[in-house]
Amino acid sequence: MAMRQTPLTCSGHTRPVVDLAFSGITPYGYFLISACKDGKPMLRQGDTGDWIGTFLGHKGAVWGATLNKDATKAATAAADFTAKVWDAVSGDELMTLAHKHIVKTVDFTQDSNYLLTGGQDKLLRIYDLNKPEAEPKEISGHTSGIKKALWCSDDKQILSADDKTVRLWDHATMTEVKSLNFNMSVSSMEYIPEGEILVITYGRSIAFHSAVSLEPIKSFEAPATINSASLHPEKEFLVAGGEDFKLYKYDYNSGEELESYKGHFGPIHCVRFSPDGELYASGSEDGTLRLWQTVVGKTYGLWKCVLPEEDSGELAKPKIGFPETAEEELEEIASENSDSIYSSTPEVKA
């Protein structure tokens, strides 16, 4: 019997979820951060969606959010003309980086020493986080607001996207290496370090390019306008979501559509695979995050393949606020399937 995809629904946000990012895999699992127009980015356990805490301090919509590799720091980009860096264990704000316009995107270097930002003022900024009083380095060249900016090639290069252009920059010389022009607005961009692959979405197209040369690799066409796409870590699958409220799963090698799912009640703004490839997360206009299994029916996280009569139907209650100490934090995130906040029983039934 075919297994039914049952996503885990993560509630808590009150406005559209516009960005999300996973950390790397740490000794305590991996983590997920979400950016929302409610101005309150949230941190969750990545494999279960369990809420850990909310970063409080922005005074406007948060457009971008990211975690460093070991999930000790978070960074957010917001409409209040600031980017903020946070202690992801305590939830404390570490620094506020003032900008001249709305900030849309943030990204840490691999060693977490530098933060890249971009936004409506068309400038890329590089902040030395060990010298918070120092002025950032600035890169100009974009002709419209920057939507996404990412470190690539072991932080030697930078990828950035504005409305209809993707640009590749050399970090050392701060100069443009190459650019790609599109005939419609670029909606998202993802960088895959293994293989140096760049995933770009625009209109109904999902395009793959070399992140080193920007040369095209392949492209797919989706049935609807796509806002975001993500490539599986093993490059087996691609998932994409957009304006028709659906998530599409493709075979990366053949381009064949394998499955499509409808669970959100609004357009999907962001989708990303987890670092282990076992699930992917989606964020929507409906204000929720949903976690989806890559292989439906596999026991993983809160999913357990059970028969209907084995389901107890019990749900746990959520916690509120960051733990008071790092020790409490580690105890919480190390506990299996800690407090759940789901509106329906998270399981896959045979």
UniProtKB/Swiss-Prot annotation:
Keywords carried by this UniProt record:
Cytoplasm, mRNA processing, mRNA splicing, Nucleus, Phosphoprotein, Repeat, WD repeat
SUPFAM superfamilies named in the record:
WD40 repeat-like (SSF50978)
Origin superkingdom: Eukaryota
Q: Which PROSITE patterns match?
A: WD_REPEATS_1 (PS00678), WD_REPEATS_2 (PS50082), WD_REPEATS_REGION (PS50294)
Q: Which residues carry this modification: Phosphotyrosine?
A: 342
* CDD domains xref list: WD40
Q: Where is this region: Disordered?
A: 326-350
- Compositionally biased intervals (Polar residues): 337-350
Whether Metal-binding counts among this entry's keywords is no
- For the modification Phosphoserine, the affected residues are 312, 335, 338
Task: Please tell me where this protein is predominantly located.
Answer: cytoplasm
Where is the protein situated, by its record's location annotation? Cytoplasm; Nucleus
Q: Which GO terms describe its biological process?
A: alternative mRNA splicing, via spliceosome; maintenance of gastrointestinal epithelium; negative regulation of transcription by RNA polymerase II; negative regulation of transforming growth factor beta receptor signaling pathway; neuron differentiation; protein-RNA complex assembly; spliceosomal snRNP assembly
Its quaternary organisation is: Part of the core SMN complex that contains SMN1, GEMIN2/SIP1, DDX20/GEMIN3, GEMIN4, GEMIN5, GEMIN6, GEMIN7, GEMIN8 and STRAP/UNRIP. Part of the SMN-Sm complex that contains SMN1, GEMIN2/SIP1, DDX20/GEMIN3, GEMIN4, GEMIN5, GEMIN6, GEMIN7, GEMIN8, STRAP/UNRIP and the Sm proteins SNRPB, SNRPD1, SNRPD2, SNRPD3, SNRPE, SNRPF and SNRPG. Interacts directly with GEMIN6 and GEMIN7. Associates with the SMN complex in the cytoplasm but not in the nucleus. Also interacts with CSDE1/UNR and MAWBP. Interacts with PDPK1. Interacts with TRIM48.
Q: Which PANTHER family match?
A: EUKARYOTIC TRANSLATION INITIATION FACTOR 3 SUBUNIT I, SERINE-THREONINE KINASE RECEPTOR-ASSOCIATED PROTEIN
Report the sequence similarity comment from the record: Belongs to the WD repeat STRAP family.
Known role:
The SMN complex catalyzes the assembly of small nuclear ribonucleoproteins (snRNPs), the building blocks of the spliceosome, and thereby plays an important role in the splicing of cellular pre-mRNAs. Most spliceosomal snRNPs contain a common set of Sm proteins SNRPB, SNRPD1, SNRPD2, SNRPD3, SNRPE, SNRPF and SNRPG that assemble in a heptameric protein ring on the Sm site of the small nuclear RNA to form the core snRNP (Sm core).
- Any idea what this protein is called? Serine-threonine kinase receptor-associated protein
Species of origin:
Mus musculus (Mouse)
Q: Which gene encodes it?
A: Strap
